């Protein structure tokens, strides 16, 4: 292992021990902000420190096996050679794992997200597919132990959604979903197609990280806040109260709605959070076009040609065009089994980062 890398791992291990001690002190436990910050740092360091511990234990095992090669018993020497071969392979694997764990982290990886799906090219069929995508992501959230809730929705005339916004909360949500942003293309025979012809439609997906304390100054005078009656499920209650909220940020023309909660106060708070996320994403895009959270770079125009992924229902095939990944298990994927798609994307991203670091 490179000495500088080893020194960095030693420093991280010392910091981990320091944080472990601090978290046990009454001073930190009584300071919720500091306790939360240290707990977050602890969770970030733990996988790397645990892997480094296994690496050092494996090295100690190799030293022990190397010493046994001098044993007069030939059977012991044979076992030592086997142990050396196994240990060296394990060391190589752990060193590779440590390199990945040391890669710079996206500061948004641990954040909750607002996931937006919009029907693009394809009319009614695009709206139906938007509904299918919303359901797919909801099912995936369930599998991950996350919570998914619809913030706002505009239903399609024949089902699905013209637009739907979900808030997904849980552990490391953004890290798993950030590569879902872009144009998703579907090829299938619509239920309204009498001739049995395959149609091509498209939807756009945007992934916006949610910020707890957004450092962005929004002047209340720049906001127009409207209330209206919520539509959709909810029984008679939604017809009696103007609980839904629409907020317009006048300088940027950004409009957000929230009608998920029965409480107008909760809807307003959720809408403000979404507004902040959108404005910040737009500001980041303006400052740095390479930021992955940039919403306009994520979604494109919704044209079929700007695709990151194709869902071909007649063939039961999903193709991710960014990494030339093809999987023939579309039914399972649409039911939320997205790990076989997301994991290769993460691995490719890590490989690109490793190559970039090696090149520099």
Curated annotation (Swiss-Prot):
SMART domains (alphabetical): PCRF
Processing and modification events after translation: Methylated by PrmC. Methylation increases the termination efficiency of RF1.
InterPro entries linked: PCRF, Pep_chain_release_fac_I, Pep_chain_release_fac_I_sf, Prokaryotic/Mito_RF, RF-1
GO molecular function: translation release factor activity, codon specific
UniProt key word Zinc: no
Localization, UniProt: Cytoplasm
Origin superkingdom: Bacteria
NCBIfam families associated with the record: prfA, PRK00591.1
Similarity comment: Belongs to the prokaryotic/mitochondrial release factor family.
Role this protein plays: Peptide chain release factor 1 directs the termination of translation in response to the peptide chain termination codons UAG and UAA.
HAMAP family noted in UniProt: Rel_fac_1
Name of protein: Peptide chain release factor 1
Organism: Methylococcus capsulatus (strain ATCC 33009 / NCIMB 11132 / Bath)
Organism phylogeny: Bacteria, Pseudomonadati, Pseudomonadota, Gammaproteobacteria, Methylococcales
């Amino acid at each position: 292992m490179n000495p500088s890398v080893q020194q960095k791992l030693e420093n991280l291990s010392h910091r981990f021990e320091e944080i472990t001690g601090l978290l046990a002190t009454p001073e930190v436990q009584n300071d919720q902000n500091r306790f939360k910050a240290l707990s977050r740092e602890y969770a970030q360091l733990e996988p790397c420190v645990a892997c480094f511990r296994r690496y050092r234990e494996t090295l100690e095992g190799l030293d022990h096996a190397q010493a046994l090669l001098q044993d007069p018993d030939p059977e012991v020497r044979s076992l030592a050679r086997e142990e050396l071969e196994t240990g060296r392979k394990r060391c190589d694997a752990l060193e590779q794992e440590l390199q990945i764990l040391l890669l710079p982290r996206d500061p948004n990886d641990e954040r909750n997200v607002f996931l937006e799906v919009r029907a693009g090219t394809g009319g009614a069929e695009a709206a139906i597919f938007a509904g299918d995508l919303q359901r797919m992501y909801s099912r995936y959230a369930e599998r991950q132990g996350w919570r998914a809730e619809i913030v706002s929705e505009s239903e399609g005339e024949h089902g699905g959604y013209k637009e739907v916004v979900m808030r997904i909360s849980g552990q490391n949500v953004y890290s798993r979903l950030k590569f879902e942003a872009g144009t998703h293309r579907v090829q299938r025979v619509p239920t309204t197609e009498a001739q049995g012809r395959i149609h091509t439609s498209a939807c756009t997906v945007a992934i916006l990280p949610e910020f707890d304390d957004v450092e962005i100054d929004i002047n209340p005078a720049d906001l127009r806040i409207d209330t209206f009656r919520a539509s959709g499920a909810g029984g008679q209650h939604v017809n009696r109260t103007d609980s839904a909220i629409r907020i317009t940020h006048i300088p940027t023309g950004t409009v957000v709605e929230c009608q998920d909660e029965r409480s107008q106060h909760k809807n307003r708070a959720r809408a403000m959070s979404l507004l902040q996320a959108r404005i910040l994403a737009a500001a980041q895009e303006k400052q740095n076009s390479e930021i992955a959270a940039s919403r306009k770079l994520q979604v494109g125009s919704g044209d079929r040609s700007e695709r990151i992924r194709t869902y071909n229902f007649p063939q039961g095939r999903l193709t991710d065009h960014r990494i030339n990944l093809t999987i023939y298990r579309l039914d399972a994927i649409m039911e939320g089994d997205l790990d076989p798609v997301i994991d290769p994307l993460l691995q490719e991203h890590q490989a690109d980062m490793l190559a970039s670091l090696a090149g520099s």
